[in-house]
């Protein structure tokens, strides 16, 4: 199977390989034990499941377990309580009969026992990002030849849930004299707001793998969707944007100086409210490294572009649609049709079938 970050598909192939999208299916394993989707007398089963993925938040998996209550003994069985306890490892695959793709690996964060007409256990699992958000190593000092090396040092604390073989990094933007850096805030804040900025990286966790990859990489479109065929609903919000990005650089002497290049952003299909753009100052910390400064500036530009357009939609269930990729939409309107970055995704399978909800930017 192709990596979720690199595979490209077309809907005709997906429709053919997944039996016309007719039989949605999923698999959930807790500590290696599978919980079935369909009911059999006396066995646990799940009738619906929802997976939320984001490039900027922890992934979460929610599902309700039925057939877990012993009516005669008036209790949830001990075996069930042992299986569905906080801290147990969970993996989830989504797709169609005979063709499932792993999208989530994490641990049970909360278990809610609901006593009603049909006693139910509601389970919420989260991925490694939640652990990183809750762990504050404020003031810890790291040394390394690159910020990628520092990132790998941070990730060693999570080797039990994400071993080194599941950490995907691009080559450092620059490597030279050993550097030293102090952590501020949680592990997640340190990686996301400091290391990603300094090394021009994107960081996210997907299907149990941690990605620390080039933010300026060319993001291929995972698939092209057509309204009326693949897209069930879609909305697009265009915002007023007219600003000049003025970039400042912190050099090796910790002094701030302005770069000569200024970039003006102006949204399409809009009228200027005032004749000149607003000014936004962005400071990049490249320690005098011109290559790193250029990469950080490109990342800042890409982030500003996200402000102009925000879209959301729902399509037939396609597990290959994940954050960190691009998505192409067609046959909506000539000024909307195009390729956008996937910001967040929700995969849901219930009595109504399998749908994928997405948020796009760019």
Question: Model features per residue range: what roles?
Answer:
Residues 1-128:
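Assembly/oligomerization scaffold segments
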Residues 1-15, 212, 221-235, 264:
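Compositionally biased, intrinsically disordered low-complexity segments enriched in polar/Pro/Gly
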Residues 106-114, 216-218, 340-352:
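Short, compositionally biased
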Residues 92, 212-213, 249:
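Short hydrophobic/aromatic-rich beta-strand segments that constitute the beta-sheet cores
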Residues 48, 102-107, 122, 139, ...:
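Well-ordered beta-strand positions in beta-sheet-rich domains
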Residues 105, 148-152, 188-192, 246, ...:
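Extracytoplasmic/secreted envelope proteins and their assembly/folding machinery
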